[in-house]
Amino acid sequence: MYKRQINNIALIVAGALVGAAGVTLSLAMSKAMNRPLMSVLAGGFGGGASAGGEADGPEGTMKETSADDVAVQLVYADKVIFVPGFGLAQAQAQRELADLGDLLKGHGVEVSYAIHPVAGRMPGHMNVLLAEANVPYEELIDLDDINPQFPSANVALVVGANDVTNPAARRPGTPVSGMPILDVDKSQN
């Protein structure tokens, strides 16, 4: 059996920094998800029920719509809240979303972006993507500050976010129970 030693100090330091960054991100994620760190590291999510809890389908009243109907709602709205998520990052659609926001602002619509701390691949991912698309920082509003604004929003447009908007988090016994969510279901549309 060979005995190996790492004699490269730079490699050891780099490894320690990567490990420390990983622990820091894990702590931030566990805090934002309202979970103990060990639960996050072990992959534990709730009590083992299905993601929807007892109900197998969506809750509430569902209304079929079309792109044309959504466009009309957006243009005639006074206030629109965009809710970006991991799907936005995967589609690399942050510039298109920012362009839509600019178009609506040009029609006098108040536009803001609801930022969940764990949306995307890591904490702060949505902030970085939207800043890259030149969305003004003042329009990026975090979870605690944006949730009271949803009832006054004419439209909440969810773009690639699901777990951070899942109302099952409000029910005990679901895998996402207790995780803070964006209250998109409280908007007018």
Report each predicted region and the residues it spans.
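Membrane-interfacial segments at transmembrane helix termini in multi-pass membrane proteins
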Residues: V13-A77
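Membrane-helix interfacial "entry" motifs
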Residues: N7-L11
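Conserved small/polar residues in nucleotide/adenosyl-binding loops
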Residues: M1-Q5
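Structured cytosolic domains appended to multi-pass membrane proteins
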Residues: D56-T174, M179-Q188
